[in-house]
Amino acid sequence: MVYKYDFLIIGSGVAGMSYALKVARAHKGKVCMICKTSLDEANTSFAQGGVASVTNLEVDNFDKHIQDTMIAGDYISDYKAVKQVVTMAPEQIKELVEWGVNFDKQQDGKFDLHREGGHSEFRILHHADDTGAEIQRGLMEAVRNCPDIDIKENHFAVEIITQHHLGARVTRRTPYINCYGAYVLNPETQKVDTYLSKVTVMCTGGCGAVYQTTTNPVIATGDGEAMVYRAKGTVADMEFVQFHPTALYHPGETHPAFLITEAMRGYGGILRLPNGESFMEKYDKRLSLAPRDIVARAIDKEMKKHGLDHVCLDVTHKNPEETKHHFPNIYAKCLSIGIDITKDYIPVRPAAHYMCGGIKVDLNGCSSINRLYALGECSCTGLHGGNRLASNSLIEAVVYADTAAKHSIEHVDEYDFNEKVPAWNDEGTLTNEEKVLITQSVKEVGECMSNYVGIVRSDLRLKRAWDRLDLLYEETENLFKRVKVSKELCELRNMINVGYLITRMAIERKESRGLHYTIDYPVHAYDKK
């Protein structure tokens, strides 16, 4: 089957839905959103903390938020991107509220603001401790009520279509690579359909599932980054993987591991060893409120030093009723496994959480491939640099959805559908009846990345990861050519591509910076004398 849409959106989180709503109301053409699972199962739903925006101008200002972001990014953030997100944030917050998103307010009607690690002021808007789910709910309601958006749930994008599929030779040096749409797997027919578009927008979210333990759902397999890389697009900063310092330690729950939000440390939570001894004073003067990379490395070091599988977060000294009010979901979750957080320590450990790199884009969300935009976690805007400041990601997605929508609405009439695109060819392939080949390889990718490309790295570990991934790549590509396409096989292929990109860029960065810490190059390159 061949479908034609002026705007084709791959992904359904805050970035994809915000963009869809903005272009739909412009009435510049047909809009389609491809959802890998159901519309409500995006990575956005798992974000607990909140949305960073300067709203209390009595004590806060844009310069402070910009400075906090630059410091957290270890001074390699793109200043223009930082300024754009920070200054546009308040207006985008208003739009979220107009779409039906609720943020907690104080009795005087002002927003109830949290403060999180790395922020110099209280500026985190939130909805209790499930802000992501509330944003997803509000946007999802608006999208479902919009008759101009076609939603294709449980459909899987296999590849983006470029002139390569028309027989042209495309390399990373090819100027003006064009995107003509995507090949998409239909779950009902198990056939790959052709979706032609004038504009394609990648909003596929993160890639935490390439690690053994992650706060991301199992669907976060780096599909967007992998598809664009294979299409010879530019991908950047993939070595900067953020590990959330405090995922709930509960063996068996790894995809996703339950997130203990940063706001709990902003609220006054103290990191301790199981024996009650605090340890952050040894690592940073900001103690438990230090940026995530510092806290994650500190926890990792203490766990290795003492042979522990977790450390603890302590909020037992806080008012029990306040704790329950601010963190109802965390309280309920911990209680369900026998932990009363008002009386007991919370067992926590780091887990893969956020990809700061991704598909390289400009201030309008344009990638290096013509007619292809990338938004949200799968993109690399330059905002995060070497490390993401807490709660900057949801607002980044909304801001770039706005700039990309304006840019694509302005230019969509310049493009035509490419009618010469061939149908997906799977002649001569077999139905794969040995799923164990896929499930075992997925497990191997997770073990390889966690053991060798984790919080602390070395040349030796990275070389071992490279070799293991190379072998998995050869095996999986051979399987891909031999059998019919399946979602599971495509995800494995994408995970291997993303694992390779993280490893390669980690090898190439001969310094420690931000989230990338290697024992062979423990300082910044410019610190060496």
Residue ranges of predicted features:
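Rossmann-like flavin
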Residues: 72-112
